[in-house]
């Protein structure tokens, strides 16, 4: 399958995850974006083959994974129309973070996985500044976010106040077990930034969950049109980012990225 088809279906799935959906009679989401993974895309499950065994053979370390197989659609949009209701529970699973899409003729396969945490992730500040470096790399060249083309944008600078706002929200989501731009106290990113002393003319936020490495989380945001647009917004000049772990430090990882343009 050509890469463009895989990218389009992943983009459509991430748009689906960005909004609250009705799934099996219940309101679900929004949930974080999925990161395209070439290893998962390269796995072909034959009859009687076990997904976990194939993942191990491909050297993909997963905390959990599932495969979806379906036939008939001739393009990505048709595929999305087929799966958004049939497989809504899997597509909206908040614990999965990586995705691989493959196709042979009109037979499609999607693998969704939760990767293990990167042993070299570092503390939240190290990881946050690594996110900044990866974001600036993305901003240094044109990007396509959904149907919108963005030109290269100036590099962002690290801001400790935005980083503190990001850490606060990541820790709150991880500790209280929710995923939303709105905190349990009702505050959103604008209030959190102000409470940490950041006076802004423009503010924005990306959140994600499940990605165990910096490269994975940034690739997930870039593969999701709304998150990608935040990354490429040329009017932002500063950024902070942080992750937090749920439970006793062994739970799901949650990421927050805050963008700002200070008042002058």
Per-region residue spans from a language model:
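Functional surface patches built around histidine and acidic residues
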Residues: 1-264
């Amino acid at each position: 399958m050509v890469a463009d088809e895989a990218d389009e279906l992943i983009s459509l799935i991430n748009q689906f995850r960005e909004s609250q959906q009705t799934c099996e009679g219940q309101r679900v989401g929004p949930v974080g974006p999925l990161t395209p993974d070439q290893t998962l895309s390269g796995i072909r499950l034959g009859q009687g083959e076990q997904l976990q065994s194939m993942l191990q053979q491909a050297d993909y370390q997963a905390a959990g994974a599932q495969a979806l197989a379906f036939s008939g659609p001739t393009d990505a949009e048709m595929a999305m129309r087929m799966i958004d209701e049939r497989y809504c529970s899997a597509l909206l699973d908040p614990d999965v973070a990586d995705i691989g899409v493959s196709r042979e003729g009109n037979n499609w396969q999607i693998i969704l996985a939760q990767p293990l945490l990167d042993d070299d992730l570092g503390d939240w500040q190290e990881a946050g500044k690594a996110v900044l470096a990866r974001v600036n790399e993305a901003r240094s060249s044109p990007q396509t976010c959904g149907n919108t083309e963005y030109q290269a944008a100036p590099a962002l600078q690290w801001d400790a106040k935005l980083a503190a706002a990001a850490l606060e929200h990541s820790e709150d989501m991880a500790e209280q077990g929710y995923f939303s731009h709105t905190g349990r106290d009702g505050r959103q990113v604008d209030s959190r930034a102000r409470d940490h002393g950041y006076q802004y003319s423009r503010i924005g936020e990306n959140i994600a969950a499940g990605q165990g490495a910096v490269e994975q989380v940034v690739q997930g945001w870039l593969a999701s049109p709304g998150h990608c647009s935040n990354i490429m917004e040329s009017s932002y000049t500063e950024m902070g980012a942080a992750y937090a772990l749920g439970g006793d430090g062994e739970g799901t990882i949650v990421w927050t990225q805050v963008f700002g343009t200070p008042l002058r």
